[in-house]
Structures are given as C-alpha cells and as structure tokens.
Swiss-Prot record:
Name of the protein in its database record: Replication initiation protein
Additional observations: The nicking site of REP proteins is sequence, but not plasmid, specific.
Source species: Staphylococcus aureus
Assigned keywords, A-Z: DNA replication, Plasmid
Biased composition (Basic and acidic residues): 11-20
Lineage: Bacteria, Bacillati, Bacillota, Bacilli, Bacillales
Length: 314
C-alpha cells in the first residue's frame, strides 16, 4: 500500500492542544432546592489501540526502518514478528504473523495515548508506522472526562447489572471506583486524577480537585463511542433529605453495601433506583452527554486522522 504524504496536514496540527476542548453549560431541575453547580468537564481520547495487517513487503520495509531509527527500541525480533516501543516509550508496537494466522486476527497492533504525543510525534507515528497497515481499525478507545470537582461521594447507577469495586484512601474517602469487568467491552473508572498525577508523575495539579471519569471501550463497543453510556447515571444522592427514616436507612445501605441490591425483589430494586435518582442534585452523565455532543465532530476528526481520512481537527 502506498504511503500518504503527511506534510500537507502539518499545518492542521501546529496549534492544536489535545486537551483544549470547548466547554458546555449545564442545567438540571430534579432537585432545585439541593442543586449544586459543578464544573464543565474537559473531554479527550486518553488511549487508543489500532490494529491492522502488514503484508510481507510492508513488514520487511517497516522492520528495516525500525531497526535503524533511533526513536525506536526493538526486541523479540524474528522474521515473522517483532515488538517495539517508540517516541520515548510512549508508543507500543507489536507484529506477530504466526499468532494472527492461528487466531484469525490482524497481525499488527499499535497502542498509545494521543494526549502524550506532540503534533510532530503524531505525524511521525502516522506516516512511519500506522500507514504501513492495511485493513486497520480501532479495537480500543478511552474517553476521559476531567472534572475539577470532588467526585468521591458520587455513585454510579446503571440500568444494567454492573460489578462495582471501590478503593478507599487513608482519609476514609473513596479514591478509585471501577464499574464493570476489565475484560468486558466497556469498563468504567472514576478516580482522583490529582492524586494519581502526584503519585505516578510527581506533578502538582493547581486545581483544588481533579477527578476523572474514564470509559474504556473495546472491540465492537468502539463503534459506539459517541453513544456508550446511555444506561449510566453518576449521581450524588442526598439520602438524608428523605422524610422516611426507613427509606433513609435503606438507601444508605444500598449506597455503601453493593451486595444488598441482590437481596431485593425486582420491584424494590426499581423503586430504590428511582428514589436515588430523584434525591440526587445532579447527574454527571447529563453533563457528559452534552459535552460529548458539543465535541463529537472534533473527536470524529481525530479518529479520521488516524484512519487516513485527512480532515484533521482544529
């Protein structure tokens, strides 16, 4: 396959900041008396995996190029496979023809976080690596919504059955919440991004709070990235506002003991899910949906860029 000339698209990237997305307003009338304003999230793709096929000729050319380029570290090199990291370890590349033929899947995979790449690095990666692949497409996309608010008290409620795991910090507050299975097509993380940046990269975030809602989409779910959480509600239930002490106690129990949902009759589960939504001053997913809608065209252009439709985002 002939390679695309990327120089014509360089100008589209010059002033691009992948974290600089437009912000949207928000309103919610469920609980006017308890309404709490929250900041508008910043939205980006935080992780991407692109798979495709290398034909024999392209595999040879790419292997020769990678063995000479100083920006690439190669290992596990054989005639039908190799592994590599590129651009200061920010990109992982794997080619394995034998494994692909055995499992009837595409033979090359490229993994990276676009937020960590400069515009020159994006062009380099597309021109020198990804453009060699045929029949390429995404098998993973992570949507990241960053809120400058404390989300430790928020509760994720789904119309579907979701496994829920919560990790608490030394203060007793929740710091990381997982919803779903890591092996599933959709896995949701809500975590204290400010603390994560400090612990993993020793970076101090100036904002008082920075929390991330991250939706990891894999396999066929990547095609629904713009419609991937309609069943989800991220709520801050004001359980103490309920007039009935019995309902207060039950809602508090359900919010803190996930296993208790399984002990309820179907009608009772429906009842308490409805109550939790009604006593919540805000549903973050409403704000996430409006933010996603406002940024959908821009995000689609990013996808198109990696898939050879050179209509880069502004």
């Amino acid at each position: 396959m002939s390679k695309n000339n990327y120089t014509n698209h360089s100008n589209h990237l010059e002033n691009h900041d992948s974290d600089n997305f437009s912000k949207t307003g928000y309103s919610n009338s469920r609980l006017d008396a308890h309404f709490v304003c929250t900041s508008n999230p910043k939205l980006s793709f935080d992780a991407m995996t692109i798979v495709g096929n290398l034909n024999k000729n392209s595999a040879k050319k790419l292997s020769d190029f990678m063995s000479l380029d100083p920006q690439i570290r190669l290992w596990d090199i054989l005639q039908t496979k190799f592994k590599a990291k590129a651009l200061q370890e920010k990109v992982y590349i794997e080619y394995d023809k034998v494994k692909a033929d055995t499992w009837d899947r595409r033979n090359m995979r490229v993994e990276f976080n676009p937020n960590k790449l400069t515009h020159d690095e994006m062009l380099w990666l597309k021109h020198n690596i990804i453009d060699y692949m045929e029949d390429d497409g995404f098998t993973r996309l992570d949507l990241a919504f960053d809120f400058e608010d404390d989300l430790s008290d928020y509760y994720a409620l789904s119309e579907k059955a979701l496994k829920r795991t919560v990790f608490f910090g030394t203060t007793g507050k929740a710091e990381t919440k997982y919803f779903g299975s890591r092996d599933s097509n959709r896995f949701i993380r809500i975590y204290n991004k400010k603390k994560e940046r400090k612990e993993n990269a020793d970076v101090d975030v100036s904002a008082e709070h920075l929390w991330r809602v991250e939706i990891e989409l894999k396999r066929d779910m990547v095609d629904y990235w713009n419609n991937c959480f309609n069943d989800l509600h991220i709520l801050k239930p004001a359980w103490a506002t309920l007039e009935s002490l019995k309902e207060q106690a039950m809602v508090y129990l359900l919010l803190h003991e996930e296993s208790k949902w399984g002990e309820l009759h179907r009608n009772s589960r429906r009842k308490y899910k409805q109550i939790i939504q009604e006593i919540s001053s805000i549903d973050l997913t409403d704000l996430m949906k409006s933010t996603l809608t406002d940024n959908e065209e821009n995000l689609q252009k990013q996808i198109n860029f990696w898939q050879r439709k050179f209509e880069f985002w502004k």
